[in-house]
């Protein structure tokens, strides 16, 4: 899930916020092990570390602009990822206000007004 967001940020800004992860894993289990290695935690801790490292400013979820990054409640349709990530995923604000693109079991999921934990402006 994090690589989708990282690729989106790189496309817009030219900055690869996933440089530490890129090419170091294959498959979900290894990805989640790397999250723990990187920030001693889960998706939430990893995003805190990355956004601090790259100077991404936290913003109010109500003020999101297209392309901004969020941590949010994971889509319940992917129980394995939900369990591995403690029910948290990352996503990108779409062009429709209040809707977030995030990776799901079978591709991208568009969530309308999901529960957002934190948001960062790019």
Features from the language model and the residues they span:
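Alpha-helix initiation/capping motif
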Residues: 1-3, 60, 112
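Active-site nucleophilic cysteine motif
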Residues: 1-13
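An alpha-helix initiation/capping motif
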Residues: 2-3, 24-26
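Short acidic alpha-helical/loop segments enriched in Asp/Glu that coordinate divalent cations
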Residues: 15-25
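...with weaker cross-activation on analogous glycine-rich loops/strands in unrelated enzymes
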Residues: 28-108
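Glycine- and charge-enriched low-complexity intrinsically disordered segments
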Residues: 106-122
């Amino acid at each position: 899930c994090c690589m989708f967001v990282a690729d989106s940020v790189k496309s817009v800004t030219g900055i690869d916020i996933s440089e530490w992860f890129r090419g170091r894993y294959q498959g979900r289990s290894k990805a989640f092990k790397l999250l723990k290695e990187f920030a001693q935690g889960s998706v939430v801790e990893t995003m805190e570390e990355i956004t601090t490292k790259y100077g991404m400013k936290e913003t109010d979820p109500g003020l999101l602009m297209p392309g901004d990054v969020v941590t949010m409640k994971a889509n319940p349709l992917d129980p394995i990822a939900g369990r591995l990530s403690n029910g948290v995923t990352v996503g990108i604000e779409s062009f429709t206000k209040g809707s977030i693109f995030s990776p799901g079991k079978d591709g991208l999921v568009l969530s309308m007004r999901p529960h957002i934990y934190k948001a960062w402006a790019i």
